[in-house]
Amino acid sequence: MRNMQEKGVSEKEILEELKKYRSLDLKYEDGNIFGSMCSNVLPITRKIVDIFLETNLGDPGLFKGTKLLEEKAVALLGSLLNNKDAYGHIVSGGTEANLMALRCIKNIWREKRRKGLSKNEHPKIIVPITAHFSFEKGREMMDLEYIYAPIKEDYTIDEKFVKDAVEDYDVDGIIGIAGTTELGTIDNIEELSKIAKENNIYIHVDAAFGGLVIPFLDDKYKKKGVNYKFDFSLGVDSITIDPHKMGHCPIPSGGILFKDIGYKRYLDVDAPYLTETRQATILGTRVGFGGACTYAVLRYLGREGQRKIVNECMENTLYLYKKLKENNFKPVIEPILNIVAIEDEDYKEVCKKLRDRGIYVSVCNCVKALRIVVMPHIKREHIDNFIEILNSIKRD
């Protein structure tokens, strides 16, 4: 149907049509989605979406209760990240969150330019080569200048390169990753923050995935030599953290937190025809259920409930890691978080063959490898099936 018809159709007819299209989609519960950082939502969130479906956080004066829930959600996330004074928003996802941090860096640079404190023609930002593609979008959109930092043998940012770059250039921002998209590695945020603070440089941490994993890891899953510290206790300026990844909330439920309310002035624009005349987020219209679900899930699960889910994912991750080694496959690294990468020279072809068999993994860019994210919907029987199919493909 490409043209809108004159007369409408019945509810039954349209719902039947929609269900046919939905049947073409993969389902998390089938256990064939191995490459996604999203998963099943908690059942309670379906009820919450229905309650808050017609709310708009972009016009908070009309939806004061919904706005209060967003603030409460930010406060709870702030408590997980060791900051009772955090300011932030529940946004569309990690991309918008990272763009907001980049906007903040750019507007601080503009202020420096006006005061004669920066000679940079564009904001200079150190970005690891493992950074999410949203940073590339930000570079193009905001005319930013990146200094791309290489990674070390452990696939984390080279802190010495960062330190040298800060000495050689007038740097406006540093990006660190707490749970890289491809391997789940954690940059040494403590060292990056030290470099940033010593040189009065803004530092942003992309913990879109790791933010709701790292604080809940039992010590037995923590690897020797990995610095798991990444939060506001280190003095970082902002953190991306996504409830619709390991926070079991519906899409879109992303999160961006800043150290305090003082950063808001670098984000606000005039919105004179709304009930609040200043707006900080990239999107204008924003769903209200993202904030409501984030608040509700954190309250519903508590630290104990979230810890249980995270550690179950880690148990299954280590089970996958063990099975891969038993079957002579080569994981790139021992898992840091619930992400496993499998070295394979023919990784793109193997990925295609897996999809032909109904198994959806993704691939890495920093190394020739298949990438698997062990989300809550992945169970051991799904892992066993995956190993069997992978063996079959490699035999062929």
Curated annotation (Swiss-Prot):
Q: What is known about this protein's pH dependence?
A: Optimum pH is 7.5-8.5 for tyrosine decarboxylase activity.
**GO molecular function, a single term:** tyrosine decarboxylase activity
Keywords of this entry: Decarboxylase, Lyase, Pyridoxal phosphate
One matching Pfam family: Pyridoxal_deC
SUPFAM superfamilies found in the cross-reference section: PLP-dependent transferases
Activity over temperature: Thermostable. Retains full tyrosine decarboxylase activity after heating at 100 degrees Celsius for 10 minutes and 42% of its activity after 10 minutes at 110 degrees Celsius. Inactive after 10 minutes at 121 degrees Celsius.
Q: How is its activity regulated?
A: Inhibited by hydroxylamine and O-methylhydroxylamine.
Q: Name one GO biological process term.
A: carboxylic acid metabolic process
Q: Which reaction does it catalyse?
A: L-tyrosine + H(+) = tyramine + CO2; L-aspartate + H(+) = beta-alanine + CO2
Q: Please state the pathway this protein functions in, per its UniProt record.
A: Cofactor biosynthesis; methanofuran biosynthesis; Cofactor biosynthesis; coenzyme A biosynthesis
Q: What does this protein do?
A: Catalyzes the decarboxylation of L-tyrosine to produce tyramine for methanofuran biosynthesis. Can also catalyze the decarboxylation of L-aspartate to produce beta-alanine for coenzyme A (CoA) biosynthesis.
Protein name, as recorded: L-tyrosine/L-aspartate decarboxylase
